Amino acid sequence: MAAAALLAAVDRNQLRRVPILLLQPREWPWKHRTVKYGTTPGGSITKVLIANRGEIACRVIRTARKMGVQSVAVYSEADRNSMHVDMADEAYSIGPAPSQQSYLAMEKIIQVAKSSAAQAIHPGYGFLSENMEFAEFCKQEGIIFIGPPSTAIRDMGIKSTSKSIMAAAGVPVVEGYHGNDQSDECLKEHAGKIGYPVMIKAIRGGGGKGMRIIRSEKEFQEQLESARREAKKSFNDDAMLIEKFVDTPRHVEVQVFGDHHGNAVYLFERDCSVQRRHQKIIEEAPAPGIDPEVRRRLGEAAVRAAKAVNYVGAGTVEFIMDSKHNFYFMEMNTRLQVEHPVTEMITGTDLVEWQLRIAAGEKIPLSQEEIPLQGHAFEARIYAEDPDNNFMPGAGPLVHLSTPPPDMSTRIETGVRQGDEVSVHYDPMIAKLVVWASDRQSALSKLRYSLHQYNIVGLRTNVDFLLRLSGHSEFEAGNVHTDFIPQHHKDLLPTHSTIAKESVCQAALGLILKEKEMTSAFKLHTQDQFSPFSFSSGRRLNISYTRNMTLRSGKNDIIIAVTYNRDGSYDMQIENKLFRVLGDLSNEDGYTYLKSSVNGVASKSKFILLDNTIYLFSMEGSIEVGIPVPKYLSPVSAEGTQGGTIAPMTGTIEKVFVKAGDRVKAGDALMVMIAMKMEHTIKAPKDGRIKKVFFSEGAQANRHAPLVEFEEEEV
């Protein structure tokens, strides 16, 4: 049966929305006193509104449910069928997909809180979580804001102010400029005085937005303007500060909690050094290689920082640390962090429960001496992104999604299910995989084992990248720093990854067996004795025969000569190498598995066939093998875009630097696109003259839409 006919039978519209099994209440494997709580907070919180979406909304709802607190969700039009909407006791629409019209619309959220009789609002992280005006708005309306007072958000949210407060409190700070003169000339002058490389950062917000490393005076102006645009878009404030950039530092942060009674504690540190685009990708607790004395000094400095602003609730004090374990205050995030689960795993706490109880007026549940530190935990952030394309964020449907089974040491923190869509309007994080074990090496082995079980089809993800990262010898040794990915780029992002011929044989076997399944199904339903499907069995007249198959790895076609043997096995020849192949397909728990033997080596893989592509997932890794489609069935090829540039993803055109008639050189900036809350510069692929610009500033461009056309060059 032709591969094209087989593919036509795969209907991707028949997606099932499959729920994710989440972590059950943990039974701690180490012998230590676990804190017992009552069923409801000591204050008046019986209903909480979560002013957020995705996995953090689901996370808060689970704890609220455990405590007997009713939950209220809000959602945009894009999130109407989202997981957090289904989980909540009540859910209310608050507007269109763009965040400014929904999740950042303070008046709408306050109105929902009032109409639903919610006594408190949990902001999650991002969106309004560090918005001083929103915290004050809640207070004025008599609604409990589950977070610090607005004054603490103000003091810590403006980085220039926080640096001064920290210095006065005896917290070490980095040399830099935090002044009010925000002219380009003044900032450039101070950068020169501090000495390159420097880091410029938006004085508000976080998440790597509005942040640039500048290594020379030559690139200062371009990077400053780009950082200002991104900061203005994200935080509505383009003011900047400048700091001396510490080369190859570690990013170490401390979880703190304060209450209304003047108490403050630290729950040890997390190492979040390994980052891309200044955003964390893998975190661990405790930080590797930190001795107890440094850990104590870190924690005490973080508590001093919290007390300096009368902090209440969950917060994170971030430090940069040099190779000698000297540390310097960087900023304080006045909210619950994305990576808070690793702290929960090593301390046996529920930090969301602590938030709710402290917001209701209770004291911190444990004294500093009572907070345990046991074992080691990792969190890997699973993103819809393409690591091979500078970690370009992606969007699209989760056609297939299967995860490792949650257990007492494995958590899946997510807000999506199979069949859901990763939206272009929001952050592309799919899930957080969190694991715990008694020591770092065991936890790392658990992380890699679990990543192998995280299988996603429908859009590109960073799972394979995380496997390479967690398996790198320097990462295993704990030699982490913020330049880890650039330093080990060749190991982590190999340019040419050739699929093993044995894996190609497995893919070919899976396709052949799938063809046999389909032809058998046709045979059962046809009455036409002359139909080729009425007698197709993979063999003819009980004799061997040979066919040629073509599969594709990247842009390279692979020719496989397949001989069907009478005993049901296959001889496959790729180039000059011969393989004896046999196996079968089976269904387990709703998934198709390929059991195969290639030259006597047995293996088992999950087998998925979708959209001209074969996906194989096994404990050895994952592969994708394409099935070439005849040219007369193919859409316009990518070569048709050589005369210009195309949009790498769906987004909004923020700036246009060129017009028709302009001459440009390869690498010149043509446009700036905002997508997935990040700024992407579209650069000229070659020297030439612009013939046409297809989009103006503010316009929405779909993925692969032509942006700029070049004039044809005379030969």
UniProtKB/Swiss-Prot annotation:
Transit peptide feature, positions: 1-38
Where found in the cell?
Mitochondrion matrix
PTM field = Acetylated.
Q: Which UniProt keywords apply?
A: Acetylation, ATP-binding, Biotin, Ligase, Mitochondrion, Nucleotide-binding, Transit peptide
Q: Which parts of the sequence carry N6-succinyllysine?
A: 577
Q: Does the keyword Kinase apply?
A: no
Q: Which SUPFAM superfamilies match?
A: Glutathione synthetase ATP-binding domain-like, PreATP-grasp domain, Rudiment single hybrid motif, Single hybrid motif
Query: Boundaries of each ATP-grasp domain copy?
Result: 163-360
Q: Which CDD domains match?
A: biotinyl_domain
Q: Which reaction does it catalyse?
A: 3-methylbut-2-enoyl-CoA + hydrogencarbonate + ATP = 3-methyl-(2E)-glutaconyl-CoA + ADP + phosphate + H(+)
Task: Identify this protein by name.
Answer: Methylcrotonoyl-CoA carboxylase subunit alpha, mitochondrial
What lineage is this protein's organism placed in?
Eukaryota, Metazoa, Chordata, Craniata, Vertebrata
